[in-house]
Amino acid sequence: MAKRPVATSSDDELPFEIEEPVAADERAFFGGQPQKPAAANAKAALPASLAAQEHYHGHRERLRDRFREQGDTALADYEILELLLFRLIPRRDTKPIAKALIERFGSLAGVFGAPAALLTEVKGVGEAVALDLKLISTVAHRTLKSELRSKQVLSSWSSVIQYCHAAMAHETREQFRILFLDKRNVLIADEVQGRGTVDHTPVYPREVVKRALELSATAMILVHNHPSGDPTPSRADIDMTKVIIEAAKALDITVHDHVIIGKDGHVSLKGLKLI
C-alpha cells in the first residue's frame, strides 16, 4: 500500500511511499555353505534403503513416461515440480520435497517467486537447489521480457501484465518498476526504481522523469506490487501517480498507466478512470 512522504532525497525532494553388513547366516557354523535365497525372494532380501531407492527410481520413470506421453496436463503441480527436482536432487525421493514446497508457498508460481532464503527453510532444499530454482525463474522472466521487446507494448497489453505478474506478484517487499517506451511504444528499458518494505516504497517523481530523459523515452508505464496480495490502490498511490504525470507532461513525456500487481490479479489506474 502507499503512504505520504516520509523522507527526502539528496535533492530535498519529498518521496512518495507506495504502499520461503547383513548378519551372517548361522547355518555356516554347522558346516556347509549358507543357502542362497531363492530368486523370487531376492527383492525382499534387499536392505530397506535399497528397496526404497528401487521404488522411487521406478516412480521417477513412471512419472517421466506420463509426461512424455500425455504432456503436462496429466500431472499435478507438485508432480511437475517433482520432475524438475529429479535433476536437482538425483539420489533422494523428491515427492515429499515437492509437496512441502507447494504447501509452503501455495503454488508453482509461489515456489519460483519465493526468495532463496525462504526456499532453504523447506526440509531437503539446500542453497544449491534454491539457487537452481531461482535460475529457472529468471529464465522464465527473461523469456517473457524478450517477447515484449519486439512488440508495441500497448497492443500487447496481456503480455505486459503477464510479465509484470511473473516478475512482481510474489515479491515479499514492495518494488516500484518503470517500463520506458520510445515514440512507437516499443520497450526501451525495464527498471526497478525502488525497493521498500512489505507495505511501502519511496518514489521520487523528479528522479522518474530524469531517468526517462536519460533514456530518451517518450512514454512510461508505472508498475508496483502489493505483497499483501490486494492490488487496490491507496489514495497516496493515486496522488503520487498524478504528480509524476504532471512532471512528465511538462517535458512531453506520456504516462500511459500505473498498474498495481497482486498475487491473484492486477489493477489499472487508467482502467479505473483514476488518472
UniProtKB/Swiss-Prot annotation:
Residues in MPN domain copies: 153-275
Biological process (GO), any one: proteolysis
Entry binding sites for Zn(2+): 224, 226, 237
Keyword tags: Hydrolase, Metal-binding, Metalloprotease, Protease, Zinc
Alphabetized InterPro entries for the sequence: MPN, RadC_JAB, RuvA_2-like, UPF0758, UPF0758_CS, UPF0758_N
Protease recorded as keyword: yes
Residue ranges annotated as motif JAMM motif: 224-237
Keyword set includes Hydrolase: yes
MF-aspect GO terms: metal ion binding; metallopeptidase activity
Pfam families: RadC, UPF0758_N
Family: Belongs to the UPF0758 family.
Family annotation (NCBIfam families): PRK00024.1, radc
The protein's name in its UniProt record: UPF0758 protein Rleg2_1511
